[in-house]
């Protein structure tokens, strides 16, 4: 299960594994108060995308589309969240004041959709398979 929580809200034992999912540390929050298990800077939207969006709800649909494209190109950035969620609860920690239009909400949606998609495997022809070291 993947849940969301603002960085300014109290930590709870039911949060499970806590991931800060932004490139920037939340203003005015100490490491001791935030108590995240992992800071996944690279899972946050690119600086260019974050600045373009600027938490403008009018841009929400286009932001999601662009952010999903970024996430699709870097699965290694968000795999730790999926792994933690399979073992229990994972909480995405974010700092935005808007609880409906922020990158953590979009990330949660992306991860839910990704978990429903079947894995894609690329078939390798015999000519391109690595050679075995066996005779």
Model-predicted segments: where are they?
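Residues lining hydrophobic/aromatic ligand-binding pockets adjacent to catalytic sites
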Residues: 1-135
